[in-house]
Regions:
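Aromatic-rich, lipid-facing transmembrane alpha helices and their immediate juxtamembrane interface loops
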Residues: 1-170
């Protein structure tokens, strides 16, 4: 259950980050997430991949920046591929950015992931891990069912509508 809580909590922080970034830049407050729950799973997956890096990487900030940014960018690339190929939608495109890979990732946002990796490993996760570990298993199973149901409903809606805007039309 521990890793589920990591995924869930960092997906929620990702949602807050997306909303804050959109507000700060004057962009659209689009949902790049799930239908009902305020979660951005790409952030949860990226955080989990960062946390799975070997311990010796954590002791070397430049290496953590590079490998953490790469690990989270892998999660972002795979999420974009899944959205495009399986669900028939696209939530983001970095087509106009230098060095982009099929519009799914680019060096600028990989660097942002690297900075997030540093904050995650050195500040956020050490403070939150003990709190998340204390959550009782039955609570975890309830949340797991809710997230799975929302993920399924979101995927079905996106596949049927073929438009990410469908998540906003509730």
């Amino acid at each position: 259950m521990e890793w589920f809580w990591y995924f869930l909590f960092y997906s929620f922080l990702g949602f807050l980050l997306e909303v804050g970034y959109a507000w700060w830049t004057g962009g659209d407050l689009d949902r790049k997430c799930l239908l009902l729950l305020p979660l951005c799973p790409v952030y949860g997956a990226g955080a989990c991949l960062i946390l799975l890096l070997p311990g010796w990487v954590d002791a070397r900030p430049p290496l953590l920046f590079l490998l953490g940014g790469g690990a989270a960018s892998l999660a972002e690339y795979l999420a974009a591929w899944y959205h495009e190929k399986v669900l028939g939608v696209s939530f983001w495109s970095y087509e106009g950015r230098p060095g982009n890979l099929r519009g799914r990732v680019c060096p600028l946002y990989s660097a942002a992931w690297g900075l997030l990796a540093l904050g995650l490993v050195y500040a956020v996760h050490p403070a939150l891990a003990p709190l998340l570990a204390a959550i009782p298993a039955p609570v975890g199973w309830t949340f797991l069912c809710a997230v799975a149901l929302d993920g399924l409903l979101s995927a079905l809606l996106l596949r049927r509508a073929g438009d990410p805007a469908a998540l906003r039309r509730r």
